[in-house]
C-alpha cells in the first residue's frame, strides 16, 4: 500500500493537471519546493537579490546593511502573483496566490542594532488532479485522483550588526527554520454508476520541519559613490518529523551553503546602478529526496538602475528598473529549469529628514518566465513593502 501511494503521488506530480488554487508556481511540486527570496519592493524593482543596496535595510541576506543606519526600523512585505502555465502533456491553465515573504524590525543597542525578522524560505503548496479509466467489475469506469500538498518553510532570524568606523559594518544572524507540510490524497469513485459503488479512498500525512542557519556579512561604502557587500549562509540539515499517524519515517535534508555578493554605484546625482549575485549548490540534497527530481546548483545574477531625482509634492519618487536571471534548484522532468525576470517599480517617501527616508512605500511589478523540459510558466508578480524608521 505504501508503495502504491508513493507511485500514485509521483504520477500526479508528473501529470500535473492543476486546478486554480492559492499557489504561486507549479515548480512548488519539484523536490523541496520553490525558494522564496526575502527581499523588499525596492530590491525587486531593481532586479537585486537582496544585498549591496544603498539605504537602510532589514534584508536577511544582507545582515550588515542594518548597521549602516542605526535607528529603529520596521518593514513588512506583501506579494501577490498571477501565473499562466503550459505543461508538456498538453495541459495549461492559470493559478494565483499571495504571501508575505518578509516582516522585520530593528532596534539599536550596544553601539549597533539588533534585528528580528520572519521570512519565507521554501514554498511547497500546490494541488493537482487527474482523471483515468479503470477496469472495475468487468467494465471501464472513470475515477478521479486528487492530490493536495499544503505547506511551506520559513525562517525566524535574530541578528546583530554594528558599524566599523564610519564607512563599514559587520553583521550576523542566527536563523531557525520552521514549517510543516500536509499531503492529502483522494481517489474519487463518485462517478461510478453501478450499484454498490466504491467509497472514495483517502489518506494523508504530515511532517513538521526544523533546522538552523547562521549568516555573516559585511558592507562598506567607498566614499559616497559606491557600496559593496558580501554574505555567507551556513545551514544545518533540515529535519522533517512525521506525525504519529503518518506512515513514514522521519527525514533529513542537506541544505547548501549560500554565497551572496552585491554592489551599488552612483554614476551621477540621481543615477545609481546595482548588481548582485547568489550561488548555492543543492546537489547533496538529491539523495535525500524520495521522488525523481532534477537537482542542480543555482547561480543567479541581477542588475538594475534607479533614477531618484523625480518627486511629487516635494517628496522623493524614485523610478527603478531591473533584470535578473538564474536557475531553479529543483526541476520537473529532465534538465535544469531557468528563470528570467524583467522588473520596474517606484518608491514613495512618506516622511524624510535631511534626505533620509523615515517612512516610505516601495512597489515593484515583475514579468517573468520559468522554463523547464516539461513545464513553462509566464507570470506577473507584484511586491509592495512598507518601511518606517525613527524614534
What are these regions (language model features)?
Residues 23-30, 140-147, 265-270:
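An N-terminal domain-start capping segment
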Residues 37-43, 80-86, 132-142, 189-200, ...:
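Flexible, solvent-exposed coil segments and beta strand-coil junctions
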Residues 1-9:
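Bacterial N-terminal signal peptides that target proteins for export
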Residues 8-17:
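Bacterial N-terminal signal peptides
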Residues 20-122, 335:
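N-terminal, post-signal peptide beta-strand-biased segments of exported outer-membrane/organellar beta-barrel
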Residues 40, 45, 208, 212, ...:
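Outer membrane beta-barrel transmembrane domains
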Residues 94-234:
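Transmembrane beta-barrel wall of Gram-negative outer-membrane proteins
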Residues 72, 188-192, 202, 266, ...:
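A structural signal for the main folded, soluble domain(s) of proteins
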